[in-house]
From Swiss-Prot:
<feature type="binding site">
    <location>
        <begin position="118"/>
        <end position="121"/>
    </location>
    <ligand>
        <name>GTP</name>
    </ligand>
</feature>
<comment type="similarity">
    <text>Belongs to the TRAFAC class TrmE-Era-EngA-EngB-Septin-like GTPase superfamily. Era GTPase family.</text>
</comment>
<dbReference type="InterPro" id="IPR030388">
    <property type="entry name" value="G_ERA_dom"/>
</dbReference>
<feature type="region of interest" description="G4">
    <location>
        <begin position="118"/>
        <end position="121"/>
    </location>
</feature>
<keyword id="KW-1003">Cell membrane</keyword>
<dbReference type="GO" id="GO:0003924">
    <property type="term" value="F:GTPase activity"/>
</dbReference>
<dbReference type="InterPro" id="IPR005662">
    <property type="entry name" value="GTPase_Era-like"/>
</dbReference>
<feature type="binding site">
    <location>
        <begin position="10"/>
        <end position="17"/>
    </location>
    <ligand>
        <name>GTP</name>
    </ligand>
</feature>
<comment type="subunit">
    <text>Monomer.</text>
</comment>
<dbReference type="GO" id="GO:0043024">
    <property type="term" value="F:ribosomal small subunit binding"/>
</dbReference>
<dbReference type="Pfam" id="PF07650">
    <property type="entry name" value="KH_2"/>
</dbReference>
<protein>
    <recommendedName>
        <fullName>GTPase Era</fullName>
    </recommendedName>
</protein>
<dbReference type="GO" id="GO:0005886">
    <property type="term" value="C:plasma membrane"/>
</dbReference>
<feature type="region of interest" description="G2">
    <location>
        <begin position="36"/>
        <end position="40"/>
    </location>
</feature>
<keyword id="KW-0547">Nucleotide-binding</keyword>
<dbReference type="InterPro" id="IPR009019">
    <property type="entry name" value="KH_sf_prok-type"/>
</dbReference>
<feature type="region of interest" description="G1">
    <location>
        <begin position="10"/>
        <end position="17"/>
    </location>
</feature>
Length: 293
């Protein structure tokens, strides 16, 4: 058995969560066109007969003015401890800028690192990709791969390349285990994902989700779980937006979240949502560490 621990790192919205989901062939991490969808380190476990590859998806590193943003960045830096391979992502349709260079400086001393040019379905010009690869080489990467989330073959090839960095070791997790995260965490993230999908650009970043209860009393008999959850917003004015006219918005969020949870957990779900205000939680570390980790 060969094993490997790796971290997927980069700016917000470069395809980190999409990559993890494609490797696992399971929708574990939130994927959104809106930045900062990932708030936690999320471990994904790829297993086959001969290999176990452990990947950590991380929040996008960005310049921030809030304590919450600082916490997200700190989680990404924390993920670099005691790992075997750094996987840095940069999209084909965006130039490498100061944000990328800042991250590359953070990982410059890692011997084992690869760069992935993502989203080549959006920009596949040979000239553009060649220039980007040259820039990445100048930033210290010896191995650079171009991938598209829409091309399953390129993901398979990438997995084989990553396997080259693995080493002999004992299996770390059961072979049928995809993540160390609990079903409560997956439910929480599914509710937050529904909010991201259905709310305007800024509001999803002002939301915290807490699972108040996760009852499995009827799971064995009816394959049913009952979930009660609270969605917290940053200020009073956001509460009305989240509820919507006549409760229309929160109803849509509830329906979407329930379907996501059912699909991911393979159970029937009764979902109950309520909304509360926690003023300026983004700058109160005790609050966001309690409710969003």
């Amino acid at each position: 058995m060969k094993i490997l621990f790796s971290t997927i790192i980069g700016r917000p919205n470069v395809g980190k969560s999409t990559l993890l989901n494609n490797i696992l062939e399971y929708d574990l991490a939130i994927v959104s066109s809106k930045p900062q969808a990932t708030r936690d380190q999320i471990m994904g476990i790829y297993s086959d007969d001969d290999y176990q590859l452990i990947f950590t998806d991380t929040p996008g590193i960005y310049k921030t003015k809030t304590k919450f943003g600082e916490n997200l960045n700190a989680q990404s830096y924390e993920s670099l401890k005691d790992i075997d391979l750094v996987i840095f992502l940069s999209p084909a349709n965006e130039e490498i800028g100061p944000g990328d260079e800042f991250i590359c400086e953070k990982i410059k001393n890692f011997t084992n690192k690869i760069a992935l040019i993502t989203k080549i379905d959006l920009e596949n010009s040979e000239e553009v990709l060649k220039k980007k690869a040259e820039k990445l080489k100048s930033l210290g990467f010896k191995e650079i791969f171009a991938i598209s989330s829409k091309d399953h073959g390129s993901i398979k090839k990438l997995i084989n390349e990553i396997k080259k960095y693995s080493y002999e070791g004992e299996r770390q997790f059961d072979e049928d285990m995809i993540t160390e995260k609990s079903e409560k965490f997956i439910a929480k993230e599914s509710i937050r994902e529904a909010c991201i999908d259905l709310l305007e650009q800024e509001l999803p970043h002002s939301i915290l989700v807490e699972i108040d209860s996760f009852s499995e009393e009827e799971r064995e008999e009816k394959n049913l779980v009952e979930i009660h959850s609270t969605i917290y917003v940053n200020k009073e004015s956001q509460k009305g937006i989240l509820i919507g006219k006549g409760g229309s918005k929160i109803k849509k969020i509830g329906i979407s979240a329930r379907k996501k949870i059912q699909r991911k957990l393979g159970v029937n779900v009764k979902l109950f949502l309520k909304i509360k205000v926690k003023k300026n939680w983004v700058n109160q570390e005790k609050i966001f560490k309690k409710f969003d980790n």
